[in-house]
Amino acid sequence: MWKMIRPENAIEQMVVTVRFSEPLSSLVSKRIIRELERSTSNVGLTNRQAVQGFQLNMQAAGQNFVPVAMPGMLFQSTSVFRVNDEVVNQISQQVEFQPTHLAYSTWTYKSWDKERETLTRLLLPAIETAVQSITIGAVRLQYLDRFVFDGDKAAVQARDLLNDETDLIAPNIFTAPDLYHSHTGRFDNVTSRSRRLSQVNVDSQDMLSDGQPDALAGRRTISLLTALEDQFLESGKEFSSEEVAGFLSSQLDDLHVHALALSKRVINNKFAQEHRLPHE
């Protein structure tokens, strides 16, 4: 039978990404990092790590691509877990800053209200600083769920977990004799200047026996990624610093509501009811 990765929910990771319409300058990036140093310290993300990204700029004359360094920063908190009688540190929360985007990730999801409050405390001051110089290009909400098959792999049936009548999953996975992947997506216009990307990625995987908790070692699993991304076309969406908080709150709540609706279309309704997941 299929089980969720943890008793309270199946969410292995949640990610919220705010993408800028163009890369921030080095001066603004330094201001953003200072804001994040304050906000992340207040929430307990005390581990810091510099990261180096790059973008390719095309020169007009020779049409050559020139790599340009883009310094960024990771802010992380860790939690102690026990894996096969060994105590290990694993990342529990992370804020990633690159001149192109800000992202908040959690591996210890409890509830939407709690996570929205946390990510707002972490990201809002930085976004308020960023919109003084640039516009917002996109906002994305992504859930990665994992389900574990507790039994003989020969008895695995994808339709016991997934809805075999949805057009969001490739139908051939329900007759696949072994591992499979189904990645689908579509764009829908929201307004004349924005569109929404909906993504559903289903990946059947056999977990390694080494380095995994006993509940996962050697098991057949299904990872289910559902994501919604609102993209603001042309020159992006412009805000004043005072308007950002209201926009971010309403935007994230709207994406969350539609993410629940997307989940209902993908998960087998009987399984969802039995495990108190969103269902019809």
Segment roles from a protein language model:
Residues 72-87, 94, 136-229:
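Aromatic/basic-lined ligand-recognition segments
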